[in-house]
Regions:
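Acidic-basic catalytic patches of nuclease active cores, encompassing PD-(D/E)XK
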Residues: 2-52
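A generic structural signal for short coil/turn motifs at secondary-structure boundaries
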Residues: 22, 84-87, 122-123
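Short, well-structured alpha-helical interface segments that form or flank functional binding sites
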Residues: 26, 30, 34, 60, ...
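Active-site metal-binding core of divalent-cation-utilizing nuclease and nuclease-like domains
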Residues: 45-74
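Conserved catalytic cores of phosphodiester-cleaving nucleases, focusing on short active-site segments
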Residues: 65-84, 100
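Mg2+/Mn2+-dependent nuclease catalytic core
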Residues: 82-104
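A short helix->loop->beta-strand "cap" motif at the edges of active sites that frequently abuts
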Residues: 107-110
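Domain-level recognition of nuclease-like catalytic cores that cleave nucleotide substrates
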Residues: 112-166
């Protein structure tokens, strides 16, 4: 899985949701099964709720998706509803970024936070990236890896790299 394929998956989900008169798009957990089915059909070796150990945590954290194969990837999903909210900004996604950046390179070569925006107005790359620049990976001695943030809206799509070393 690469960035172009993740972006294409996000765009396809937006198109699939438009086929519904009343789309199931008000919460992330209603879009999650649609994305899982799409990815399972496209990539095959997809697992949900992949466990990752986090320093200082009693039990492992869960990441939404892991795509296996010779170039494994992990992905978290965040959705902004048609009613709007700040759920795609950096602050609300701190825990997702921290989980993703702690996945070792043996478990995943690519770490992606997929942001699907269903609101009428879209974010600009500068505004969204600025909200992620202030987020850090947290304290502790552990290896941190960068995370690719992929934003998908019907009228705008872009991606940028979030560095855990800011």
């Amino acid at each position: 899985m690469n960035i172009e394929e993740v972006t294409a998956a996000g765009v396809e989900i937006l198109h699939l949701l438009q086929d519904y008169h009343r789309p199931p798009a008000h919460r992330e957990m209603l879009i999650d099964p649609i994305l899982y089915a799409f990815m399972k059909g496209r990539f095959g070796a997809v697992t949900r709720q992949h466990h990752v150990s986090v320093y200082g945590s009693q039990k492992p954290k869960r990441i939404d998706f892991r795509v296996g194969g010779t170039n494994p990837s992990v992905m978290e999903l965040a959705v902004r509803s048609p009613l709007g909210s700040g759920s795609l900004l950096g602050g609300p996604n701190t825990s997702e970024l921290r989980k993703l950046c702690k996945v070792s390179t043996t478990q995943a070569k690519l770490r992606v936070l997929l942001l699907i925006d269903l609101y009428t107005n879209h974010y600009t790359k500068g505004d969204l990236q600025a909200s992620y620049d202030v987020v850090h990976a947290g304290p502790g001695k552990f290896k941190r890896c960068p995370v690719r943030v992929v934003y998908v809206h019907m009228n705008n799509r872009f991606n940028f790299c979030w560095s855990p070393y800011k």
